[in-house]
Swiss-Prot record:
Name of the coding gene: Bid
GO molecular function: ubiquitin protein ligase binding
Motif BH3 per record, residues: 87-101
PANTHER family linked to this entry: BH3-INTERACTING DOMAIN DEATH AGONIST
Record's protein name: BH3-interacting domain death agonist
Species assigned in the record: Rattus norvegicus
A Pfam family recorded for this sequence: BID
Length: 196
């Protein structure tokens, strides 16, 4: 994918959202670090795990890239993927400030719903939407609604994964699907604005 951001939901949207959610979760992942590493290896996108962030200095003074995407080496310029990782890091920092607004009871309820094997993906998205409705009152008044919704969606995913690390894969998939269905135009605009 070049520097142009995808317009619709599809492979481009999934790529962007996978990177965004993974990057958000990777910040402060102490409770589910191993599960996140496994997930990162399974994703069909370039993800940065700890240790991948530092490029080695070469003898000619340039930095060697460790960027791989589907087995191909990607260019060294600040790519869309790097922009998305930076956005994820920024959103995770904002999420740290909102962390207290999510009640442990809500996290336990959402985790229990995700553990219910009979729920469809749509049912899980609906459970996530209901949980978001419960925390809407705690959105900061000075923050755009879409930004607050995006942060809280990923923050709920992080809290459920922290509560029950075995749910990480399901929570990740549901979160990506929820964002692609409800918030992708906002995510796309965030990426476009950062790339300009």
């Amino acid at each position: 994918m070049d520097s142009e951001v995808s317009n619709g939901s599809g492979l481009g949207a999934e790529h962007i959202t996978n990177l965004l959610v993974f990057g958000f979760l990777r910040n402060n992942d102490r409770d589910f670090h191993q599960e996140l590493e496994v997930l990162g290896q399974e994703l069909p996108v370039q993800v940065y795990l700890e240790g991948d962030r530092e490029d080695e200095l070469q003898t000619d003074g340039s930095r060697a890239s460790r960027s791989f995407y589907h087995g191909r080496i990607e260019p060294d310029s600040e790519s869309q993927d790097e922009v998305i990782h930076n956005i994820a890091r920024h959103l995770a920092q904002a999420g740290d400030e909102l962390d207290h607004s999510i009640q442990p009871t809500l996290v336990r309820q959402l985790a229990a719903q995700f553990m219910n094997g009979s729920l469809s993906e749509e049912d899980k998205r609906n459970c996530l939407a209901k949980a978001l409705d419960e925390v809407k009152t705690s959105f900061p008044r000075d923050m755009e609604n879409d930004k607050a919704m995006l942060i809280m969606t990923m923050l709920l995913a992080k809290k459920v994964a922290s509560h029950a690390p075995s749910l990480l894969r399901d929570v990740f998939r549901t979160t990506v699907n929820f964002i692609n269905q409800n918030l992708f135009s906002y995510v796309r605009d965030l990426v476009r604005n950062e790339m300009d």
